């Protein structure tokens, strides 16, 4: 057994026997990888430069005005501050903000861009934010405090289908970005409340091949399905960017996603959604 197989064997064993420990180990490893990538691509210096020229808040998009932190978890910070982050989803998010949800659940919340953003825009709606990464939970709580949302946003660790089923009440929205774990989590057979919930999930076929087809087959009978594919950003759409160098402007709105990255929005069919 070579070193790669040994590492895979240990990882699989940890995920099976001690998923929380495995999650912490995996998150720490991913953070180290991202730090090296950011330094190599010039993103570390770009972030410093951005923070000296712009306010520490979201400049545009559905969560414009939200106060932010000077760090992020396993994703680029500057696109979130610019307001270009996951711009492909802005139309869906705008619709979601008008949908009358009674609960929002964010699994894989990181520092809380979506959890706190939805809480800010839906002040009477409870938001549950889950992440296995200790640093993510700390930052999500800190951002909730920064925006005076601490009584509205509940931050917790691991979320399994049983826990998800408990927190889904009324007309709920589930936001899911958990690096392939969505295949384990989004199980209507184990969480029947998913049949009445709307679900916005980032798909990770590059981690678990076939996951898109699996999830679509689970929700096809109860939900209308919309697939959204990632596209490149045009910095000209964000006039608030103060960088003069065109290369820096492009870098500021880049998210470095895998080719053909997709999201799925599962909207509960009329008559199936909770009242």
Where are these regions (language model features)?
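Membrane-proximal basic amphipathic "stem/tether" segments
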Residues: 1-64
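Conserved class I S-adenosyl-L-methionine
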Residues: 101-110
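Rossmann-like AdoMet/SAM-dependent catalytic core
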Residues: 8, 12-16, 206-275
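S-adenosyl-L-methionine
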Residues: 130-181
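Class I SAM-dependent transferase core
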Residues: 52-87
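Conserved SAM-dependent methyltransferase scaffold
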Residues: 115-116
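Conserved glycine-rich SAM-binding loop
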Residues: 110-111, 181
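Conserved alpha-helix/loop element of class I SAM-dependent methyltransferases that forms part
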Residues: 83-100
């Amino acid at each position: 057994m070579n070193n790669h197989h040994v590492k895979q064997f240990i990882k699989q064993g940890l995920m099976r026997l001690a998923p929380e420990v495995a999650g912490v180990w995996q998150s720490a490893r991913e953070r180290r990888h991202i730090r090296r990538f950011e330094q190599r691509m010039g993103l570390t210096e770009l972030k410093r430069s951005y923070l000296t020229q712009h306010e520490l808040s979201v400049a545009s998009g559905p969560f414009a005005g939200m106060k932010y932190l000077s760090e992020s978890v396993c994703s680029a910070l500057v696109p979130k501050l610019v307001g270009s982050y996951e711009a492909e989803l802005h139309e869906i998010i705008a619709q979601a903000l008008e949908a009358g949800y009674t609960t929002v659940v964010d699994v894989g919340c990181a520092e809380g861009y979506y959890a706190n953003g939805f809480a800010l825009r839906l002040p009477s709606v409870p938001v549950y934010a889950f992440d296995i990464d200790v640093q993510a939970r700390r930052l999500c709580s800190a951002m909730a405090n920064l925006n005076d949302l601490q009584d509205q946003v509940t931050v917790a660790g691991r979320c399994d289908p049983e826990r998800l089923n408990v927190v889904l009440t009324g007309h709920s929205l589930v936001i899911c970005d958990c690096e392939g774990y969505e295949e384990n989590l989004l199980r209507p057979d184990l969480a029947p409340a998913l049949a009445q919930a709307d679900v916005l999930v980032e798909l990770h076929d590059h981690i678990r091949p076939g996951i898109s087809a699996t999830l679509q087959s689970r929700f096809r009978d109860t939900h209308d399905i919309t697939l959204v594919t990632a596209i490149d950003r045009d910095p000209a759409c964000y006039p608030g960017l103060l960088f003069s160098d065109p290369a820096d402007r492009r870098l500021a709105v880049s998210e470095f996603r895998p080719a053909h990255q997709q999201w799925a929005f599962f909207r509960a069919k009329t008559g199936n959604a909770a009242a």
